[in-house]
Amino acid sequence: MTEYKSWPLGQLPPEFQRPELDQLKKNGYKFGDPREVVDIFEKKVAKFAGAKYGIAVDCCSHGLFLSLKWYKDVMKMITEHIHIPRYTYCSVPMQIIHAGFKPVFEDVTWSGIYQLRPFDIWDGAVRWTQGMYKSGFHIVSFQLKKRIPIGRGGMILTNDKKAADWFRKMTYDGRDLTISYMDDDFEYCGYHYYMTPEDAARGILLMDQVPNKNLDSGNNRTYSDLSTKRIFNE
């Protein structure tokens, strides 16, 4: 029995459906409401990584943003600066700015994963290997060039249940999906950052094919020097 309230508009007709959910059933996975597939994927990734909880998001960048917002809005941290490598992807300092902090670029040699100091937040976008969970909030990516190339998507890994529950509502417009939409009082002013069931299904199918141990797909030599970019020096 699904814990979710049923889709308000019902199911799509077969000719409009993406194939991943049917492929998942053919591979032996069982689910009722399609949103259960997101749960399956979250639990599968969390177990693979060595974390207690996984919260699927529509991209790694939004996972970083929500992790930063947890520290700012829930933990009420007064830290102003977040220290990151100067050689990384440009969305990382942008999310820091969007979350209300200021990025500080440092010379850091890294591979696969690095910390957004002083917080226990880890950008693990370019690492995918069994047991990879570091600590705190560890965010992974399912972008097209990553080891699990869904095309778009990410996941926040954590051992903190309170944070996991908060993230789950914040990714879906503040909604509690176990309550009917008409009855939900929307506990939080959330974001539209959820992962679709079809993308989660693709992630499951890919995980069942990709090796458990993989080399990092990026490091400090993969990216340009963000400390020289005009947008971060204004």
Task: State where each predicted segment sits.
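Conserved PLP-binding active-site segment in aminotransferase class I/II-type PLP enzymes
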Residues: 1-77, 99, 163, 194-234
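Conserved alpha-helical elements of sugar-nucleotide-dependent glycosyltransferases
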Residues: 37, 41, 88-91, 183
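Short, conserved clusters of charged catalytic residues that mark active-site
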Residues: 40, 107, 149
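Short, well-ordered alpha-helix to beta-strand connector turns
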Residues: 51-52, 117, 135-137
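Conserved SAM-binding loop
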Residues: 56, 84, 156
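PLP-dependent aminotransferase-like
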Residues: 69-131
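Active-site region of PLP-dependent enzymes
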Residues: 128-234
